[in-house]
Amino acid sequence: NIDLMEEYNYVGLKYLLQQRCIMDFKLLFEKFPQQICPYDYETYFANSDRFVMVTTNCLTGEANYFEEKKNPERVIDIVRASSSLPFVAPIAYVDGIPMLDGGIADSLPIEYAQKQGYKKQVVVLTRNKGYRKKETNPILLKPFYRKYPNLQQAIINRNKIYNKTMEKIERLEDEGKILVIRPINPIKVGRIEKNITKLIELYDEGFRIANEIEFQMNR
């Protein structure tokens, strides 16, 4: 992904003007999977492992969980919706239903995993230990999502749900009931980061931390 970012530079304000999205979604969800680096749907569909994608339903404000192993076009629709960040990406549609990024309604889906029967969980975080999400200014919501009151409420409640879940994750981590992988050094990358050097540094740190955890688990 970093190599593709460096070559194609698919993040920028020009895309916000052209596509109403901070990223070049036409490149990401059309040219990339179809032409530049064709996605191997045959292998993906043949794999029996579960792959769950999360979106936020704009009508209900609730999380929707999808598994798709037959229809390539629907896979792209779901991934596009799951990647559509509020305010910087247009609403996407899955089966005709308006959707946005699943992180709005369920940023940390550990309860969903528990309900699915998974007793051993690995949680991969992109923030340092102790991070808590700030609330979103409700003034920003109506101009963007006037037609979706439940979505507005979900965005308002997001930080409370996120922070409560993070407290649970840290408690379970202290009790040795889940494995958490998170950055150790202070995060220097932004939400929509274009600086290749910063991205590589964060990637290298993640790779190093994962290797250290694997070494400890195999001792």
Regions found by a protein language model. Name each.
Residues 1-219:
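Patatin-like phospholipase
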